[in-house]
Amino acid sequence: MRKIVYILFALLGVGGGLQSCDNGETYAEQREKERDAISAFLNRDVVIRLSDGEELIHVGKINTISEGEFYAQDSTTNLERNEYVVFENTGVYMQIVRKGAGEKMKNGQQKRIICRYTEFNILRDSVQTTNNSAYWQTNPDIMDVTDTYGTFTASFNTSVNGGGRMYQYYGSKAVPAGWLVPLTYINIGRQINADEEIAKVRLIVPHSQGHSDASSNVYPCFYEITYQEMRN
């Protein structure tokens, strides 16, 4: 059965609310609950809709592939089969919707990247934050990213626009580690021609690769994110 989640977007975006795990559960129990939630999410046909019924994201039932299968098919995920590759060392699941215009980052490069995203708290079964609303269109989240021999480090920029939704909501410049996983495989550029599009991915990020609130409260999130190089 298709699972439909309706969302009411407020003027300043949507916040699902920070959750507390101070309920007597051990860390091991919280991790088990997280694993169960991810497993259930993979097998549900989730559709996230706006309050007016317009479809925002159709996640669908997910087919996972191994890293070996992912690399064997030129680091792509088959969209018709709704494939997500699971990275065993981090537990992050990734679907590359579009590899995007431009080129992959190179060693020593620094880039300022605009990110537009929706964050879905899998454990709470609700959208927690998004900057895909009218208010945040002119104030997107901006990452300052450095590539050092294939290892990416990043922080949210606050000097350009005072910080986007992620920074304003969580109060931290730290970029979730899960957000950096796609940078090895996607291009970072800008749309120049009509037939070009910027990079877009979908992620399932466990608490260990998430922001500080996810880490401290042990919950996984689903993300849909676009990555676009900012003009100098």
Residue ranges and their predicted role:
Residues M1-C21:
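Sec-dependent bacterial lipoprotein signal peptides
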Residues C21-N232:
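Cross-family detector of peptidyl-prolyl cis-trans isomerase
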